[in-house]
């Protein structure tokens, strides 16, 4: 009986742990992010304000401000679930927030850990 209970508990724990891991997103360095977005099927999402975006952004990024109350609705109706979403913000905080929201909806997400500031500091190409 004890073995059955322990076995059942182990299966439940494995299932819970597996689900938690599949619900995660990856935070990438500038170099790893640059490699990831070289894949043209990856959608680049900038979650800063429109003013920040216009001042400069990563090439081919689309802009949906995570601080807008309608972010979740706009993102889930705009972004296809079949694509990996590469998120950036200014420094990395807002992109993590956006990543958590999108992961809850089943998206595969990567985010730029150091944000747009890290991208610029590394001398990477920007668009204005």
Language-model regions, residue ranges each:
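Rhodanese-like catalytic fold shared by cysteine-dependent sulfurtransferases
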Residues: 2-7, 16-42, 51-84, 93-128
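Repetitive helical segments and hydrophobic/amphipathic motifs
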Residues: 12-13
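Structural scaffold elements adjacent to functional motifs in cytosolic proteins
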Residues: 44-46
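Short, surface-exposed ligand- or partner-binding patches at beta-edge/loop junctions that are enriched
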Residues: 88
């Amino acid at each position: 009986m004890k073995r059955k209970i322990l076995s059942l508990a182990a299966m439940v724990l494995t299932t819970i742990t597996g689900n938690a891991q599949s619900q995660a997103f990856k935070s990438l360095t500038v170099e790893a992010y640059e490699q990831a977005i070289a894949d043209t099927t990856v959608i680049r999402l900038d979650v800063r304000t429109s003013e920040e975006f216009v001042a400069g952004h990563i090439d081919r990024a689309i802009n949906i401000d995570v601080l807008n109350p309608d972010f979740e609705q706009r993102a889930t109706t705009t972004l296809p679930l079949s694509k990996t979403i590469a998120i950036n913000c200014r420094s990395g905080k807002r992109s993590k927030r956006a990543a958590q929201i999108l992961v809850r909806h089943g998206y595969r997400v990567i985010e730029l850990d150091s944000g747009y500031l890290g991208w610029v500091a590394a001398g990477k190409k920007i668009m204005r």
